[in-house]
Amino acid sequence: RVASKKMNNAYILKKERLKSFLKLLMKDFSLISPQLAKAGDFLLQETEDLDRINLNYDITSNTLKEFFFPARETIFSYQKKEGSFKINPIQEKVPQRVFFGLRSCDVRAVCFQDHFFSQEPKDELYWLKRNKSILISFACNRPPRRSCFCVYTKTGPFLEEGEGFDLQFIDFGRDYLVEIGTDKAGKFIKPYKRFFTLPDKSIE
């Protein structure tokens, strides 16, 4: 598999610059990444220490769903007074988040969630969280498990523009090819452009 046909929508990030990029990014965003948990499995968690990010995992035990549609969430409170009720919506302060190191199949799963929550009546809380999120996927050069079936369900191992990712990282050995998947990602990456270079034409 080679880079997207739209090479003007792709950049190169040298691996030695990745940590510096993420360190600066964490000043502006809450960073969620795959990390090794105490039980020995991998979880998508808030990143406090960049050294805990682990990209050599197969799948995480949790999914993106819990960040956008948690099992429990307080959405309003109410007061009963003189036989009537007053509803007080909870004005949740939603952080801007970057989800880094995602598998292609997990990103495609979010597309199905988006479709469901786009139906009327729209879930405004879901979209409040979703619109403040950037999804950065890592294409699988090799399936992490023999049981993976993403090829048959068209959920990976590589994604095309419009298939859910904002940025897609493809491992090219010493470098990452970084593909831009959305207009939102194009705006997102502008403050960090100094970490990226244009790809060599030979990659096409």
Protein language model features and the residues they cover:
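Iron-sulfur-associated redox domains of electron-transfer enzymes in respiratory
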Residues: 5-204
